Amino acid sequence: MSVVSLPQMLEAGVHFGHQTRRWNPKMRRYIFTDRNGIHIIDLTQTAHLLDEAYSYLREASDQGKKILFVGTKRQAAPVIAQEAKRCGMFWVNQRWLGGMLTNWDTIRTSVDQLKELETMEANGTLDLLPKKEASVTRKKLERLTKYLGGLKNMRRKPDILLVVDQRREQNAVMEARRLNIPIVSLLDTNCDPDLTDVGIPANDDAIRSIRLIVGKLADAIYEGRHGQLEDFSEEEPVPAAAPVAAVAVAVAAPAEAESEDKGEVLYSFDDEEE
């Protein structure tokens, strides 16, 4: 039985890709059709590849491997933090700082500084500082928490990178590839499947799609660490031909409402003042 059902994926809008003019031809084999100028992802393949990713992460977690969740876009950020925490892993959900992997020793120094400042805040040491110095120090603590809070307990480079929006997180992807760190990634229709080791064709823009897929991957990690979960779909297995028919029905209606976030606008975080 698949870890996610066809109705669940349809309801979450997992099948909606990008505008046809914004596709990557390498994703052709994962595309079912197009409607109203939007590519429609083949959910039969999504279900199969999600099962493979689930097994891969469950086994990796069972072996004690550490996974870093990466997703900094507005739609992904809260899901990334929530699901990484739930399964006891690490996350980056604000800005990917250059060298987070390739210059890990320097990043770890900043993480240690964050933990030191947290201790000072907890034991009241910051309250003993001059007012201006305390204010500057607290601002530094806030900034370090924002960008490095998800790495506090990560003492070494991760064994696997889990990415939402391969294109947006290209710096993280390139660093991982340089260090031969395996990548698990959602693959929207504008992505390059050659840049990931374990890919899952899916809408990486809609919040519900991100929550569904990342949630299932977090389930796999949790299961590997703690044992069997009981939250698989209880529906009967869907015959192989059914997904095609169901998707055809689902995309018969206009797709704009489900794919309004598939345009050119990208969310970015502005540099903060020191």
From Swiss-Prot:
Keyword Ribonucleoprotein among record annotations: yes
InterPro entries: Ribosomal_uS2 (IPR001865), Ribosomal_uS2_bac/mit/plastid (IPR005706), Ribosomal_uS2_CS (IPR018130), Ribosomal_uS2_flav_dom_sf (IPR023591)
Pfam families: Ribosomal_S2
UniProt-listed SUPFAM superfamilies: Ribosomal protein S2 (SSF52313)
Ranges where the record places region Disordered: 255-274
GO molecular function, a single term: structural constituent of ribosome
Keywords annotated in UniProt: Ribonucleoprotein, Ribosomal protein
Example of a GO biological process term: translation
Gene3D superfamilies from the UniProt entry: Glucose-6-phosphate isomerase like protein, domain 1, Helix hairpin bin
The keyword Nucleotide-binding is annotated on this UniProt entry: no
GO cellular component, one term: cytosolic small ribosomal subunit
Coiled coil: none
NCBIfam families given in the database record: rpsB_bact
Family: Belongs to the universal ribosomal protein uS2 family.
Protein name: Small ribosomal subunit protein uS2
Gene: rpsB
